[in-house]
Amino acid sequence: MSRIQSTFAALAAKNKKGLIPFITAGDPAPDLTVPLMHALVAGGADILELGVPFSDPMAEGPVIQRACERALKFNVSLHDVLGFVSEFRKTDTTTPVVLMGYANPIERMGQTAFVLAAKAAGVDGTIVVDYPPEECEEFAATLKANDMDPIFLLSPTSTEERIQQVAKFGSGFSYYVSLKGVTGSANIDTQDVAQRIEAIRKHVKLPIGVGFGIRDAATAKAVATVSDAVVIGSRIIQELENTPRERAVEAAQTFISGIRKALDE
């Protein structure tokens, strides 16, 4: 059982919902990434999602695009991101870390080389936005063989065929993108999300995390009633943007603590 699977099993046993915060590695500065990761765990995160900076993040809204730009100004590479995970693992061997990004940096490193380096660093899973499940059977199998989970995105426009492919190739959890569009955009219709997740669960037996558009504790709580976990990214990055650097770590922990409290009420 992978660390992600164990985490969801433990949450289910306690009748709790998962909290999965997202930050972009290297933003607002590389030396803050590992302290931010620890602060998010201290604030109640169950799984961490670490964004790999990329110059053309097509699924991201302006907030995460700016985060990528800031990280790339520090020349943060995939190699550096794996270094952050290794550093984090020195003092936290239990919290799962999922890398989220795009195919290009992985292709440049080579899929097998990436999987081996990710395993050595202590990565638990990947979300590769532009790797559809039907095109990465081999990559998914290599990840699973190395105790990591290939996590795939589903959206309001996903066909039944795509949902079945995610059921076949995915593991760990499935990430339901609650809005058509980019991260950080409009408000969520929880009833619509509930109906879509019900349809997905007919095929996908994995836990389902919902992200895109979760802005505050109330939205997180509403979404958690129909899912197994909530993913929250743009709002955390906005907190970091609006906070002086010396208070960034504290601000992230305070924000995520508020979300955790709402989920547990």
From Swiss-Prot:
Alphabetically ordered keywords of this record: Amino-acid biosynthesis, Aromatic amino acid biosynthesis, Lyase, Tryptophan biosynthesis
UniProt EC number: 4.2.1.20
Keyword Lyase attached: yes
InterPro entries registered for this protein in UniProt: Aldolase_TIM (IPR013785), RibuloseP-bd_barrel (IPR011060), Trp_synthase_alpha_AS (IPR018204), Trp_synthase_suA (IPR002028)
GO molecular function: tryptophan synthase activity
Pathway: Amino-acid biosynthesis; L-tryptophan biosynthesis; L-tryptophan from chorismate: step 5/5
Gene Ontology CC annotation, any one: cytosol
PROSITE patterns registered for this protein in UniProt: TRP_SYNTHASE_ALPHA
Similarity remark: Belongs to the TrpA family.
Matches recorded under NCBIfam families: trpA
Subunit record text: Tetramer of two alpha and two beta chains.
Function statement: The alpha subunit is responsible for the aldol cleavage of indoleglycerol phosphate to indole and glyceraldehyde 3-phosphate.
Protein name: Tryptophan synthase alpha chain
Species name: Herminiimonas arsenicoxydans
Gene of this entry: trpA
